[in-house]
């Protein structure tokens, strides 16, 4: 067996005499054959697959190593949804490295027919102690979600993930059409590193939406959700593009009993390109965002820029040396137009150090939102470089999949 590929192994059960030579015996074999999908071990194609998170909240409390300790029998190369599922092996939490060597259609090429069908087939659960890494620029996922739920120690690297399209959005009177399904979900999970990942609406951008009941027929939800007490997460060197409501940290104002003291997330060296809002919006959590680049346009026909940092109930955010390039900014509530990069949703704690807006320094701490300064100690080592246009260009060119 070629150990660089996934395979299906037929386990045959026979009784009595040999099946050879008689049609009846052959029929008996076929009737009792069980097709079992198993994953074949593969060689390690990149040493990057064994790296651990090196900075940010994902380094704390034991760190995030994913499948770095995988035995040779738990290293896989996959390029189809059947191979991917076989490598994941359900809830198996033994360390594993899954190298994605092709574009994986999570639907298996079979269109979803209803909400229930999409729920059953599109949500792919990732077990503990797993690294999923794309090889070169080949690692892609479409038509589904990677769900990291109720587990620990997961790494997603060098992947392109197209945000799923809800085939059956629900309509709410007064709120219009609302979609389910996020590209990546981190739910009730600790220690996750997302690095060099691109998440995009891809083939169905929002300007292609149709209209139903006189309302825009919205079919996208979020790019990344981090919720229900998840903790110790780093998102780095990634690219979020062509999306509206992008990253949500903390899903409800009423979930403080589970979220308070958790939802600690670091964003660094990421590019947010033509996204509308929520980069991120945070409730209860503590977010550190440094050396990120935000590019938007208030007049964009599909992804109208609204804000970058949304400070929600009991949420806090420290911004350091970020670069915002936002076209057609406007004053909001009498404040300088630069203040529109931050929005207060009942949150009280926000500070910025050294960020630039459209190439110039600006004091975001003086916008008059009534925020208290972010005073919590950052426990990990990091280097927030002084942001310049040159550095912003470098961060942008290095962000996303295919750049590892």
Curated annotation (Swiss-Prot):
One matching Pfam family: Pectate_lyase_4
Cofactor annotation comment: Binds 1 Ca(2+) ion per subunit.
Reaction catalysed by this enzyme: Eliminative cleavage of (1->4)-alpha-D-galacturonan to give oligosaccharides with 4-deoxy-alpha-D-galact-4-enuronosyl groups at their non-reducing ends
Presence of the UniProt keyword Signal in the record: yes
The keyword Transmembrane appears for this protein: no
One annotated GO biological process: pectin catabolic process
Name of this chain's protein: Pectate lyase E
Native species: Dickeya dadantii (strain 3937)
